[in-house]
Amino acid sequence: MTQPLRIVFAGTPEFAAQHLQALLDAGKSIVAVYTQPDRPAGRGQKLMPSPVKQLAVQHDIPVLQPQTLRDPAAQAELAALQADLMVVVAYGLILPQAVLDLPRLGCINSHASLLPRWRGAAPIQRAIEAGDSESGVTVMQMEAGLDTGPMLLKVNTPISDEDTGGSLHDRLALLGAHAVVKAVDALAAGTLTPEVQDDSLATYAHKLSKDEARVDWTRPAVELERLIRAFNPWPICHSTLNGETLKIHAAQLGEGRGVPGLILDASKAGLTVACGEGALSLTRLQLPGGKPLGFGDLYNSRREQFAPGLVLGQ
């Protein structure tokens, strides 16, 4: 009987933890887990372990949390594990060539896009923002470039008009977890045929920033509606009204025209705001110190605050 692959898993957030759970459920031999150092979180700024570390500890898997993998001592520690394969999912540290070369079968990565489209840090949100009709997960053999390695397996899923960054994230985490298990089995059996990426088709999913979440009402309503969905649950689009920050959790295309940012209509159905082209109906908002509410609930108690003729973003 062939020996099971000795797998080292490297990942940090919940997206990665779901991949680790799938490998454990499939009975894979995880000899160690690499994850980012514990970070301060919450109001008390207590050091919190990553979701991947929490899962590894539950399963008594050794956890390593180096600040960098460029350090010869950290590389020696990894080499001592004698891994056949390293599975990397949203780890957050760059793997130098010396690390990529250590496992017998190299390192594979689960990336939340249909490569070569949306290489980089925020593929889920950028796909929604751009109006893509589908997304997916690509499992690839890692190389030194950013998400440039040969593709081993792809799984796709349609992007619906209701999808948010959060809903698509959750779906891709599930798809990716199954895909990684399938890829590991195929690698062990030697049945995978790597497909080289066409660099001419590559696009880059730049990291999200809070500055991008400030709504520019001169943009077309169609673009802003996609941005609001893409940036939910983080960083959440926002604007200002009456000197207060207004977080916009949900919106849909509305009717009407006017100066960008002008409130055209307010009703329990939504707050209709003019854009550079068309209008948006804001349906779920959050005021400072409050929680997200359907606009109907806000309208009942603060009708005068959302009067037509007022302008957002000033």
UniProtKB/Swiss-Prot annotation:
GO terms for cellular component: cytosol. The gene is fmt. This is Methionyl-tRNA formyltransferase. It is an enzyme of class 2 (transferase). It holds the Pfam family Formyl_trans_C. It comes from Stutzerimonas stutzeri (strain A1501) (Pseudomonas stutzeri). InterPro entries: Fmt (IPR005794), Formyl_trans_C (IPR005793), Formyl_trans_C_sf (IPR037022), Formyl_transf_N (IPR002376), Formyl_transf_N_sf (IPR036477), Formyl_transferase-like_C_sf (IPR011034), GART_AS (IPR001555), Met-tRNA-FMT_C (IPR044135). PROSITE patterns: GART. Its EC number is 2.1.2.9. Signal peptide: none annotated.
